[in-house]
Regions:
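Helix-start (N-cap) detector for alpha-helical repeat units in TPR-like alpha-solenoids
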Residues: 61, 95-96, 129-130, 163-164, ...
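J-domain helical core
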Residues: 1-15, 24-47
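Alpha-helical segment of the N-proximal tetratricopeptide repeat
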Residues: 56-96, 100-109
């Protein structure tokens, strides 16, 4: 790359329009500049390619993460957390490990600790829709519905097609007895994902609370068919 820079400087000085305004020099100068930029970008790309996967994700961190995932599959959440921690010792900014650790803690109903994991993710990546959604779920489990709604708002602003966030938002509104808003959320969730059985069931619950029994029955029937 050093030789390319030197050659570029020589040619640029030779054909620069300010130095020699002869016909065609401006065009040649532009061609030289364009060629240099192309070579420079190609060199940068080559440098990026030479970075090994193991430089970004050390082998021991990946191994610990994979062991944690295997334990999650067996529902051994306590042991899985130990291995997620090992992965995070080596890679403190490993977003997915923080999310999966938070999920394991949530399954153990350790919601406050899970919240800490999702906060870590949001420090690393404030636009993580999964972290906003899961943080909202934890807050909802802790009956902090207003705070949970703020999280679901963020998730759906970042991704309006996040049907799970719309569903959980509906659950919060239902618990706050804001039935019309809850119904709107479940409607959005089922429009985005028509085979979302949970949202159909939840929509039925809202309609039943609103004394719309026939409509509620249709939703329950829809949910039942989808679960078969």
């Amino acid at each position: 790359m050093k030789e390319i820079k030197q050659a570029y400087r020589k040619l640029a000085l030779l054909y620069h329009p300010d130095k020699d305004s002869s016909d065609g020099n401006e065009t040649r100068f532009k061609q030289i500049s364009d060629a240099y930029q192309t070579l420079r970008l190609h060199h940068k790309t080559e440098l990026k390619i030479t970075i090994k996967f193991t430089d970004l994700y050390p082998e021991d961190a990946v191994s610990s993460y994979e062991q944690a995932e295997a334990l999650i599959a067996k529902q051994n959440y306590e042991e899985a957390i130990v291995f997620y921690d090992k992965a995070l010792e080596r890679l403190p900014r490993y977003e997915n490990a923080w999310i999966k650790k938070g999920d394991a803690l949530s399954r153990l109903k350790r919601y406050e600790e899970a919240l800490g994991c999702y906060e870590k993710v949001l420090q690393i990546n404030p636009e993580s829709t999964d972290a906003w959604n899961l943080k909202g779920v934890c807050l909802s489990e802790l009956k902090k519905y207003d705070e949970a709604l703020e999280c679901f708002d963020e998730a759906t602003l970042l991704n309006p097609m996040h049907y799970a966030a719309w569903n959980f938002m509906g659950v919060c509104f239902f618990n706050l007895r804001k039935l019309e808003k809850a119904l709107e959320c479940f409607d959005k969730a089922t429009k985005i994902k028509p085979d979302f059985a949970v949202a159909w069931h939840n929509k039925g619950g809202v309609l039943l609370r609103m004394n719309k029994k026939k409509e509620a029955e249709k939703c329950y029937e829809k949910a039942k068919k989808l679960r078969q």
